[in-house]
Amino acid sequence: MGANQLVVLNVYDMYWMNEYTSSIGIGVFHSGIEVYGREFAYGGHPYPFSGIFEISPGNASELGETFKFKEAVVLGSTDFLEDDIEKIVEELGKEYKGNAYHLMHKNCNHFSSALSEILCGKEIPRWINRLAYFSSCIPFLQSCLPKEWLTPAALQSSVSQELQDELEEAEDAAASASMGSASAGSRPGRHTKL
């Protein structure tokens, strides 16, 4: 076991939306979990790979111009090592895929709560995800909030990099396959499995 590392919930105000929702006592917040000087968060995109991304802790500018840092909430501590946390985040990425994002049922705050429960045994404070709870009771609210407005810019960058990596891997595999089949053709009796 490692040293006790603080587990911190960084909360960001989506200030342009809160101008409308604060009058009814509901804020719209983005959150991420900070541990070992790294912050992990979740957002949506249309692809079937992880929607989890990493930013510099508390840096709202990496999320985009509509986000403002609100506060840091210490949730507890963890004895997991940094390598363990990377594995946990990778495993959570199988559940928190970009195309599984749903504003009311699987959003950044749900991810933060899941990671916090694993790391220190505590959920995030309920007020942070209050909008998801209330809007699940009032279905028309879901249609009032476009999903693309709530995808942090840092995630867009992460998605672009993931797509570029997949494209390069596909090109490398295609080049290897064509080289392999060309050389396989010159050897009698050899079969190339694609």
UniProtKB/Swiss-Prot annotation:
Alphabetized UniProt keyword annotations: Cytoplasm, Hydrolase, Protease, Ubl conjugation pathway
UniProt record, GO biological process: proteolysis
Predominant cellular place of this UniProt entry's protein: cytoplasm
Biased composition (Acidic residues): 163-172
Pfam family, one: Peptidase_C97
InterPro entries: PPPDE_dom, PPPDE_sf
Domain PPPDE, residue spans: 5-149
Annotated stretches, region: Disordered: 161-194
SMART domains: DUF862
Signal peptide range in chain numbering: none
GO cellular component, one term: cytoplasm
Low complexity bias (residue ranges): 173-186
Assembly: Interacts with RPS7.
Role played: Has deubiquitinating activity towards 'Lys-48'- and 'Lys-63'-linked polyubiquitin chains. Deubiquitinates 'Lys-48'-linked polyubiquitination of RPS7 leading to its stabilization. Exhibits palmitoyl protein thioesterase (S-depalmitoylation) activity towards synthetic substrates 4-methylumbelliferyl-6-S-palmitoyl-beta-D-glucopyranoside and S-depalmitoylation probe 5 (DPP-5).
Record protein name field: Deubiquitinase DESI2
Gene: DESI2
